[in-house]
Curated annotation (Swiss-Prot):
Gene label: nifJ
InterPro entries reported in the protein's UniProt record: 4Fe4S_Fe-S-bd, 4Fe4S_Fe_S_CS, PFOR_II, Pyruvate:ferred/Flavod_OxRd, Pyrv-flavodox_OxR_EKR_sf, Pyrv-flavodox_OxRtase_EKR, Pyrv/ketoisovalerate_OxRed_cat, Pyrv_Fd/Flavodoxin_OxRdtase_N
Protein name in the entry: Pyruvate-flavodoxin oxidoreductase
Family matches, as CDD domains: TPP_PFOR_PNO, TPP_PYR_PFOR_IOR-alpha_like
Organism classification: Bacteria, Pseudomonadati, Pseudomonadota, Gammaproteobacteria, Enterobacterales
Key words, A-Z: 4Fe-4S, Electron transport, Iron, Iron-sulfur, Metal-binding, Nitrogen fixation, Oxidoreductase, Plasmid, Repeat, Transport
EC code: 1.2.7.-
Enzyme class: oxidoreductase
Length: 1173
């Protein structure tokens, strides 16, 4: 019988099925698998029952390795156990997977398959991770669509239990895991009928228990190990028939036909593609298109990849097939070919059938694969000598592996399908609104629906594109929309940056959010856009969603205005019903944030419908001619890579563009060329009110506001409007607070922290400040001035150039101000090892690199290894540098010792002696290095080769580097804690900066061991106290430790950073960082104020532990925080992560709130005792 139809994504489908068969799950967040664990956690908290009448027991672990170990233990104890992971997380589970398979335990690993980090990190889908564990002994089952995930995930669980073999159930990350489809949901009652209860009983009876004790995991010798390994063969031999049997039962239940290998296409096909994953849906769609035009082609979809059953493989391939292409979504450098291709060739080697077989790679790292690419593959198979070892979807103009793109103009989508594309900005709500819209269409109508959301890695402020399809036929199009019926754009600045209307069909609809009135459109819209609108009879509408949102008090969240306008224009369902459904979705999405938020969004829906304006398109637009613009002279990287990528044209870049940077090396300072212009309002300097305190620049997350010192001559030559005032503290300079409107995120923290009554900064609309762009560029062009202040003061630090600028961090980010400050103090000699996480994403999302250089070309050098090994990676960087500097010191010492025999220039000798005596000192190291390099004696010695004083390869190491290890609390408190502890214990001179947001910010806000009790994170509510990382580090006695909160005490922040860097040993700085995941009721524009509130309420304490004070006979612990004066519970109520607990779990909210306060008070009392001892 047909089941209930529901709109959901692949992750939800996998979670739904897995919940039914799971007693215990151990989890760890990693993109894109995290939503599976979140759903299971949410259902468990709601009391949802599995097939055994129990709620699932869920435990968040410190790493994926820990999660695999925990489910291994649960399985041995007789509990059915499941976990969810991807990419590097899956690799961390590998050792346990061998054990679980070897011990014949029925685990299921649900994997949203994702690229592995190689020359770069990539969070998007391919099969590198899944292929990497094919040798573990786990069975492997692959799905191609959301519906298949629902159906076949059940097969994985059922067969694992019956067959005693663990399963890796995998599907494409993002493309399937996050694609929303209307699917049929399996009923738990039907699944219960399929479950082999006797097999469950046997499994439980075989569990470890002291009532029937056995020993497992012995150490075996060569005499028996081999034999016992071979003894498990029978389980693998029996498994394919079991899988086929359960697939037959699912097929009978659903009417959808499943086999280990599913063939689709012409029964007498001559050409066939073999593949697995979402590409099979695209191939099926293309097969229908080609066969309808007289060709004879087909596709074999692989479901059960391990064990690979030859019997079932040959059963479904038409005997007419003569040419086969095998597609692998992975790359194995140095191998003869990729895995599935080798398996297929091996299969045919064992038969009498000898078709032509070629293989190719496709869609690595989430690359889109289109029907036109599939046609290229079929065209290749039709060639007299089909190309082998090909790639598709790229232009490989270096090793020439790529197939030429088919020039056919095709549309393979189902007839009657409507395609809509929505351009948005990360954090503007466009994606969330479209998720609501597609669920309304899918759940409230009889139409099929599909949604997919494409976005970059920026934390917010990046481009998002929502792709929605709906129609009366099933949708098999797992690729981005290239021909749209409707296009919406939520950002007016995009009209000059992107080809917004590319692919909009003639007669299609275009909705633009803009503040321009009808008269201004002719001036503001680019010529090419106007011409396209007129020439293609585009129905053009505008709405001032930003203005409406601000009037309603919604700030930059205008998503519901745009969404209601969409429903009005798209005419999918009656408008009154659409409004009703939208308001229901608002209640569901924002209900826990308070009725006021709900009411404002309801008004936004009504306003969006009422405010849409249809534009009468002038016919003259058809004949407009493009203006000739002289191109700017730009660095090759910017011109050839950054600009095309930022125009969303990176897919078309050829392989040759990356010649010379194959190892993943990117130049510094590229973010300065982006000029994103994403702010709604930007700060405007009120010259007469400013006291020149520089606090606004100090806390700016994006370095978009800076104090500039100007000479009289520079002031006289300045452009009009370049106001300045006499600089305080110096007699011969003028002062200006420069603002970059196009680099500002518009958070407003600068205005919030301004101490002047009436404020020296006011937030004004971005478009009103276009004149500031030229003034900013002039300010940056001025000659750098010597700092007239002490750089270790708040004011003085801001006269140092920030070497972290214009990152993709969220507006109001609490992390970047700390990192930026460190670069201002030590950036010219910094080496940074950065853990994967938020700070690695805002720190190095290609092509935007915010770490930059000074006028001498010096700046932070930055690298990322992995999430789990960052401390060790940073230590390794230090050890490598130390080894080279030791060689350098040996050379210098030898030169000085040989001075009587080989006389040195007196100046050089003095400089070398000074350098050798102070080589490990940070302050003054640049000056000492430059003195050595600048002496005439050094030049002469090098020229005459009289001594190996400083060999050229080592000269860069004269200056002592400042070694920093950056990471978030998920790294420092959890997955990387073991390594961090070891590095701190080593006594080596490294500086660790932990951005403590108290959640896993990068994966969506899950709890870490830094999360206090009562905080609602994605994995439900935290019930245990916050780990005191600082106290743990202090126990060594020789680690410098500080807790800081910039918004509470800027001077203490500066002092701690300066002391930590100067300390000749390990240092740990734990920095409180407000985050969008906290849900600040005062908004992220007040994130610095929130840090102050945290300290004033006693939620957070600022302190420093300085081991050198102990050596001087003083107390090494200094508590910098004052006695709390603010209400602790009021502070908690000001953040949604706490306040929502009352709405969700009122029965124990007060208890946990009190526990959180008691924990904080106890922690603070402990600090007080340390400070007074």
């Amino acid at each position: 019988m047909p089941g209930k139809m529901k709109t959901m994504d692949g992750n939800t489908a996998a979670a739904y099925v897995s919940y039914a068969f799971t007693d215990v799950t151990a989890i760890y967040p990693i993109t894109p698998s995290t939503p599976m664990a979140e759903s299971v956690d949410e259902w468990a908290a709601q009391g949802k029952k599995n097939l055994f009448g129990q709620t699932v027991k869920i435990m968040e672990m410190q790493s994926e390795s820990g999660a695999a170990g925990a489910i291994h233990g649960a399985l041995q104890a007789g509990a059915l156990a499941t976990t969810y992971t991807a990419s590097q997380g899956l690799l961390l589970m590998t050792p346990n997977m061998y054990k679980i398979a070897g011990e014949l335990l029925p685990a299921v690993f649900h994997v949203s398959a994702r690229a592995l980090a190689t020359n770069s990190l990539n969070i998007f889908g391919d099969h590198q991770d899944s292929y990497a564990v094919r040798h573990t002994g786990c069975a492997m089952l692959a799905e191609s669509s959301v519906q298949q995930v629902m159906d076949l995930a059940a097969v994985a669980h059922l067969t694992a239990i019956k067959g005693r073999i663990p399963f890796i159930n995998f599907f494409d990350g993002f493309r399937t895991s996050h694609e929303i489809q209307k699917i049929e949901v399996l009923d738990y009652e039907d699944l219960a009928h399929l479950l082999d209860r006797d097999a469950v009983a046997r499994f439980r009876q075989n569990a470890l228990h002291p009532d029937h004790p056995v020993v497992r995991g012995t150490a075996q010798n060569p005499d028996i190990y081999f034999q016992e390994r071979e003894a498990s063969n029978k389980f693998y031999m029996a498994l394919p028939e079991m899988v086929e049997s359960y697939m037959a039962k699912i097929s009978a239940l659903t009417g959808r036909e499943y086999h280990l290998f599913n063939y689709y296409g012409a029964p007498d096909a001559g050409r066939m593609i073999i593949a697995m994953g979402s590409v099979c849906e695209t191939i099926q769609e293309t097969v229908d298109y080609l066969n309808a035009r007289g060709e004879k082609v087909g596709v074999l979809t692989v479901h059960l990849y391990r064990p690979f059953s030859l019997k079932h493989f040959f059963k479904y391939i038409p005997k007419s097939v003569s040419n086969i292409a095998v597609l692998d979504r992975t790359k194995e450098p140095g191998s003869l070919a990729e895995p599935l291709y080798l398996d297929v060739k091996s299969a045919f080697y064992n038969s009498d059938w000898r078709p032509v077989i070629v293989g190719g790679r496709y869609a690595l790292g989430g690359k889109d694969i289109l029907p036109s690419h599939i046609i290229s593959i079929f065209d290749n198979l039709a060639a007299e000598r089909p190309r082998d070892g090909f790639t598709v979807g790229i232009n490989d103009d270096v090793t020439f592996t790529s197939l030429p793109l088919s020039d056919r103009d095709i549309d393979t989508s189902s007839s009657g399908t409507t395609a809509c594309k929505f351009w948005g900005l990360g954090s503007d709500g466009t994606v969330g609104a479209n998720k609501s819209a597609i669920k309304i269409i899918g759940d409230k109508t009889d139409m099929y629906a599909q949604a997919y959301f494409a976005y970059d890695s920026k934390k917010s402020g990046g481009v998002t594109m929502s792709h929605l399809r709906f129609g009366h036929n099933p949708i098999r199009s797992p690729y981005l929309i290239d021909k749209a019926d409707f296009i919406s754009c939520s950002q007016q600045s995009y009209v000059n940056k992107y080809h917004l209307l590319a692919g909009l069909k003639p007669g299609g609809t275009f909705l633009l959010n803009c503040s321009w009135d009808v008269a201004e459109l002719d001036e503001k819209l680019p010529v090419a856009m106007k011409r396209y609108i007129a020439a293609n009879d585009i129905q053009f509408y505008i709405v001032n969603a930003v203005g409406i949102a601000q009037k309603l008090g919604l700030g930059g969240r205008f998503n519901m205005i745009m969404q209601s306008a969409f429903f009005k224009l798209a005419d999918i369902i009656p408008l009154t019903r659409a409004v009703e459904y939208l308001k229901q979705s608002i209640e569901h999405a924002y209900g826990n944030k308070g009725q006021k938020i709900v009411d404002m969004n309801n008004l936004a829906v009504d306003s969006g419908i009422e405010s849409v304006v249809k534009i009468s398109v002038p016919q003259a637009w058809k004949h407009l001619e493009d203006k000739v613009v002289s191109p700017k002279k730009l660095p090759a990287f910017i011109k050839d890579i950054l600009i095309p990528m930022n125009r969303q044209e990176g897919d078309s870049l050829p392989v040759s563009i990356f010649d010379g940077i194959e190892d993943g090396t990117f130049p510094s300072g590229t973010s300065a060329y982006e000029k994103r212009g994403v702010a709604i309002n930007v700060p405007v300097w009120q010259t007469d009110k400013c006291t020149q305190c520089n606090q606004c620049a100090f806390i700016c997350p994006h370095a978009a506001i800076r104090p500039v010192l100007i000479s009289e001559e520079e002031r006289q030559n300045a452009p009009a409007g370049f106001s300045a005032k006499r600089a305080s503290g110096t007699e011969d300079a003028w002062y200006r607070l420069a603002v970059s409107p196009l680099d500002c995120s518009g958070c407003g923290n600068c205005a919030d922290v301004c101490p002047v009554k009436g404020k020296a900064l006011s937030m004004q609309p971005l478009e009103s400040q276009e004149h500031e762009i030229e003034l900013w560029e002039y300010a940056l062009s001025l000659t750098p001035k010597a700092n007239p202040q002490n750089k270790f003061t708040v004011k003085g630090s801001q006269f140092e150039q920030p070497l972290l600028e214009f990152s993709g961090a969220c507006g109001g980010c609490g992390e970047t101000p700390y990192a930026k400050l460190v670069t201002q103090l030590f950036g010219d000699r910094m080496m940074i090892a950065n853990a994967t996480g938020c700070s690695s994403i805002w720190g190095a999302s290609a092509p935007s690199i915010p770490y930059t250089t000074n006028h001498k070309g010096q700046g932070p050098t930055w690298a990322n290894s992995l999430f789990e090994d960052n401390a060790e990676f940073g230590l390794g960087m230090l050890l490598g540098v130390d080894a080279i500097r030791d060689t350098l010191a040996t050379q210098v010492k030898a030169a000085l010792d040989n001075a009587p025999d080989v006389p040195l220039d007196a100046e050089l000798s003095a400089c070398l002696s000074d350098w050798l005596a102070n080589k490990d000192q940070g302050e003054g190291t640049r000056e000492r290095a430059e003195k050595v390099g600048d002496t005439s004696g050094f030049a002469n010695a090098r020229e005459k080769s009289r001594t190996p004083t400083v060999s050229m390869p080592h000269r860069d190491y004269l200056a002592n580097g400042s070694h920093w290890i950056f990471g978030g609390d998920g790294w420092a408190y959890d997955i990387g804690f073991g390594g961090l502890d070891h590095v701190l214990a080593s006594g080596k001179d490294v500086n660790v900066l932990v951005f403590d947001t108290e959640v896993y910010s990068n994966t969506g806000g899950q709890s870490s061991k830094s999360t206090p009790a009562a905080a609602i994170a994605q994995f439900a509510c935290k019930k245990t106290r916050k780990k005191d990382l600082g106290m743990m580090a202090m126990s060594y006695g020789y680690v410098y430790v500080a807790q800081i909160a910039m918004g509470a005490d800027k001077n203490q922040t500066l002092r701690a950073i300066a002391e930590a860097e100067a300390y000749p040993g390990p240092s740990l700085i734990i920095a409180y960082a407000a985050c969008i995941n906290h849900g600040l009721r005062i908004g992220m524009g007040c994130s610095q104020r929130e840090a102050r509130r945290a300290v004033e309420a006693g939620y957070w304490a600022n302190y420093r532990y300085h081991p050198e004070l102990k050596e001087a006979g003083k107390n090494p612990f200094i508590l910098d925080s004052e006695e709390p004066e603010e209400d602790f519970q009021a502070f908690l109520a000001g953040e949604v992560r706490y306040s929502s607990l009352k709405k969700l779990y009122p029965e124990f909210a007060e208890f946990l709130f009190k526990k959180t306060e008691d924990d904080a008070r106890e922690r603070l009392e402990g600090y007080k005792k340390l400070a007074s001892s």
